[in-house]
């Protein structure tokens, strides 16, 4: 049975890792990172409600006039 030749494995593995590292560096270099993130000031927007603009009266049964 022939012996497995492993003399080139080290060169192959190192070349593969080096090429993957270079490819990843090129990918990260093309990515545009956002500039310093700044928190936006949260402004509370109030929507006009119809019940805020007019006066309403609630009639309870006890306050109704007697018949």
Swiss-Prot record:
**For this UniProt entry, what is the primary localization, expressed as one broad class?**
mitochondrion
Q: Cellular component terms, GO, for this chain's entry? A: mitochondrial membrane; proton-transporting ATP synthase complex
Name the keywords, alphabetized.
Acetylation, ATP synthesis, CF(0), Hydrogen ion transport, Ion transport, Membrane, Mitochondrion, Transmembrane, Transmembrane helix, Transport
Asked whether the keyword Chaperone is assigned, the reply is no
GO MF annotation, one: proton transmembrane transporter activity
N6-acetyllysine PTM positions read 54, 57
The disulfides recorded in the entry are: none
Q: Name one Pfam family in it.
A: ATP-synt_8
Compartment(s) where it occurs, according to its Swiss-Prot or TrEMBL record: Mitochondrion membrane
Q: Does the keyword Lyase apply?
A: no
Its placement in the membrane is given as: Single-pass membrane protein
User: Any idea which residues bear N6-succinyllysine here?
Assistant: 54
Give TM regions.
8-24
- Gene Ontology biological process terms in this record: proton motive force-driven ATP synthesis
Q: Which family, according to UniProt?
A: Belongs to the ATPase protein 8 family.
Q: Describe its partners and assembly state.
A: Component of the ATP synthase complex composed at least of ATP5F1A/subunit alpha, ATP5F1B/subunit beta, ATP5MC1/subunit c (homooctomer), MT-ATP6/subunit a, MT-ATP8/subunit 8, ATP5ME/subunit e, ATP5MF/subunit f, ATP5MG/subunit g, ATP5MK/subunit k, ATP5MJ/subunit j, ATP5F1C/subunit gamma, ATP5F1D/subunit delta, ATP5F1E/subunit epsilon, ATP5PF/subunit F6, ATP5PB/subunit b, ATP5PD/subunit d, ATP5PO/subunit OSCP.
What does it do?
Answer: Subunit 8, of the mitochondrial membrane ATP synthase complex (F(1)F(0) ATP synthase or Complex V) that produces ATP from ADP in the presence of a proton gradient across the membrane which is generated by electron transport complexes of the respiratory chain. ATP synthase complex consist of a soluble F(1) head domain - the catalytic core - and a membrane F(1) domain - the membrane proton channel. These two domains are linked by a central stalk rotating inside the F(1) region and a stationary peripheral stalk.
Q: PANTHER family recorded for this chain? A: ATP SYNTHASE PROTEIN 8
Q: Tell me the protein's name.
A: ATP synthase F(0) complex subunit 8
């Amino acid at each position: 049975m022939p012996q497995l030749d492993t003399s080139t494995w080290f060169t192959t593995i190192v070349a593969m890792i080096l090429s993957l590292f270079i490819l990843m560096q090129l990918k990260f270099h093309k990515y545009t990172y956002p500039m310093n993130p700044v928190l936006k000031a949260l402004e509370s927007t109030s929507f006009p409600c119809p019940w805020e603009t007019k006066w309403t009266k609630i009639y309870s049964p006890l306050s109704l006039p007697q018949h």
